[in-house]
Amino acid sequence: MLLAWVQAFLVSNMLLAEAYGSGGCFWDNGHLYREDQTSPAPGLRCLNWLDAQSGLASAPVSGAGNHSYCRNPDEDPRGPWCYVSGEAGVPEKRPCEDLRCPETTSQALPAFTTEIQEASEGPGADEVQVFAPANALPARSEAAAVQPVIGISQRVRMNSKEKKDLGTLGYVLGITMMVIIIAIGAGIILGYSYKRGKDLKEQHDQKVCEREMQRITLPLSAFTNPTCEIVDEKTVVVHTSQTPVDPQEGTTPLMGQAGTPGA
C-alpha cells in the first residue's frame, strides 16, 4: 500500500512539473502558444507593441508589453497576433501562423534562440523608418509621450503573470489529479480494512463452531468407548443329579419290607 502511495505521488509531481515547465508557452482560449514568436508569417516581423500602439488610435487598451512577440491582448478568437508594417508605413494587425506550442518545449526552445537574440539587439534602421514621424501626428504625439509611462508598469505585470499563471485548464488538471489520488488512497484503505475485518470475523466464527462441536461430541464419546461396552450376562444353572449306589454287604437292613426281623 505504501508503494502505491509513493508511485501516485511521483506521478502527480511529474505532471505538475510538466505543467510548470512550459515557461516558453502561454495559454490563450484553451490553447498553448509559443511565447517567443516574433514573426506572424514567413518574411514578416512583428513590431514593438509600445511603438506600434503609440501611433494608432484604435489600439487595445491593455497592451501586450514592451516586446515584439505575438500576443492576444484583445482576446481575438483567431488567436495571437502582432503589428506589422503596412504598405503606407502604418502598423496593421496580422494574425500569427504556426504558433502552436510543441509537445516538448525543451526541443522547441533552441530553434528560436537566434530570433530572440536578434530581437533583443534592438530595431534596425529599416524598422525605424517604418513608424510614422512624431511631427506628422501632433495630437497623437502628446498622447504617445504619456501613454507608455502608464502602460509599462501594467504591461510588465501582465507579462509576469503570464509566465507564472498556468491558466484555468492547468488548475483544473491539478485539482483533478489530487482528487483522483485521494480517492484511490481512500479506496485502498477501505478495501484493506474491509478484507481484514472479514477475515477476523471468519476466524472468530470458525472457533465458535469448533467449540460447539466439542460440546456436542463430548457426551457421545463415553458411549463409543470400547472399554465401556455393556456385555449381556448369561445365567448358568447347575442341576444336581443323584447317582444310584450299589448296596454292599453289611449295609442291608436287618428288617425286611414287612418289618419282620430276619425275614
Curated annotation (Swiss-Prot):
Residues 242-251 have a biased composition (Polar residues). It is found in: Cell membrane. Gene3D superfamilies: Plasminogen Kringle 4. Residues 190-263 are cytoplasmic. Residues 22-168 are extracellular. It holds the Pfam family Kringle. Disulfide bonds join C25-C101, C46-C82, C70-C96. Glycans are attached at S39, N66. N- and O-glycosylated. O-glycosylated with core 1 or possibly core 8 glycans. N-glycan heterogeneity at Asn-66: dHex1Hex5HexNAc4 (major) and dHex1Hex6HexNAc5 (minor). Residues 1-21 form the signal peptide. Negative regulator of hepatic phosphatidylinositol 3-kinase (PI3K) activity. This is Phosphoinositide-3-kinase-interacting protein 1. It comes from Homo sapiens (Human). The gene is PIK3IP1.
